C-alpha cells in the first residue's frame, strides 16, 4: 500500500536532453523540485526507476551497459521531476566522452538550484567505486542529500547483504546525515517502501510546501 504523499506511479516521460554538456538548454526551468538518479552503467538504474514507479518501461533498459547517453526527465506533477542521468564509468565508452560526462554531471550537481536529492545507485556486489564516491562528495559539497542505493540486493544472501550494507554505512559515516544507505531489489521489491519515503520527503522541502500553501491562500 502506498503511504507516500506523492504517487510515484503517476510519473510520465517529459523530455530527453541529447547532450549532457548543454543541460540547461533542454531541461525545464530551474524551478520546483528535481531528484536525480545517477550510477554506473551496470548499476540497474533503469530497472530501479521502473520498479519504484511500477511502470515496466518508463525508463528503457538495455542489455548493453553505457548505451544510454540521454538525460531523461520524468514528471511527477507540475512542481516535481525525476531526472535519469547517463550511466558513468563503462569501460567501452571512449575516455573523452567519460570526461565530458563527469564534468557535466559535476556542473549539474553544483549549479542546479532545484535539485532536492540525488540517488546514487551501486551494485551491492561492487559498491563505492571511485566515481560513486565522487558523485556523493560532489552532492554533499553542494549540500544536496544523497541516498546510496545498493541495488540487486537479491543477488546476496541476507547475512552477506547486511554485512555489505553495514560496511558501506561505516564507509560513508563521515558524511553524517547527508547520506543514507539502503539495500534495494527491483526484482523482489526489497527496500522499496523506505526508498519511496525518502523520495517523498525530498519532494516536499520546506520552501516548496510554504510556497504551495501561500498559493492556496
Swiss-Prot record:
Q: Summarize where Mg(2+) binds, as residue positions.
A: 46, 68
Q: Where is the signal peptide?
A: none
Q: Which cofactor does it need?
A: Mg(2+)
The biological processes this protein is annotated with in GO are: division septum assembly
Q: State the function annotated in the UniProt record.
A: Necessary for normal cell division and for the maintenance of normal septation.
- NCBIfam families per the UniProt record, alphabetical: GTPase_YsxC
Q: Please state which protein family the record places this protein in.
A: Belongs to the TRAFAC class TrmE-Era-EngA-EngB-Septin-like GTPase superfamily. EngB GTPase family.
Q: Under what name is this protein listed? A: Probable GTP-binding protein EngB
Q: Which organism is it from?
A: Shewanella amazonensis (strain ATCC BAA-1098 / SB2B)
State which gene encodes it: engB
Amino acid at each position: 500500500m502506498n503511504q507516500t504523499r506523492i504517487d510515484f506511479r503517476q510519473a510520465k516521460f517529459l523530455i530527453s536532453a541529447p547532450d549532457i554538456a548543454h543541460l540547461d538548454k533542454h531541461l525545464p526551468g530551474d524551478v520546483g523540485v528535481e531528484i536525480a538518479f545517477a550510477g554506473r552503467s551496470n548499476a540497474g538504474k533503469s530497472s530501479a526507476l521502473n520498479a519504484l514507479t511500477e511502470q515496466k518501461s518508463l525508463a528503457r533498459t538495455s542489455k548493453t551497459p553505457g548505451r544510454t547517453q540521454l538525460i531523461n526527465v520524468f514528471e511527477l506533477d507540475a512542481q516535481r521531476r525525476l531526472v535519469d542521468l547517463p550511466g558513468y564509468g563503462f569501460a567501452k565508452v571512449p575516455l573523452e566522452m567519460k570526461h565530458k560526462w563527469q564534468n557535466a554531471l559535476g556542473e549539474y550537481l553544483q549549479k542546479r538550484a532545484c535539485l532536492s536529492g540525488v540517488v546514487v545507485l551501486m551494485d551491492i556486489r561492487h559498491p563505492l567505486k571511485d566515481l560513486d564516491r565522487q558523485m556523493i562528495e560532489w552532492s554533499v559539497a553542494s549540500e544536496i542529500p544523497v541516498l546510496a542505493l545498493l541495488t540487486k540486493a537479491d543477488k546476496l544472501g541476507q547475512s552477506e547483504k547486511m554485512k555489505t550494507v553495514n560496511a558501506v554505512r561505516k564507509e560513508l559515516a563521515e558524511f553524517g546525515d547527508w547520506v543514507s544507505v539502503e539495500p534495494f531489489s527491483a526484482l523482489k521489491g526489497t527496500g522499496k517502501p523506505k526508498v519511496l519515503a525518502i523520495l517523498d520527503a525530498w519532494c516536499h522541502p520546506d520552501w516548496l510546501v510554504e510556497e504551495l500553501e501561500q498559493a492556496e491562500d
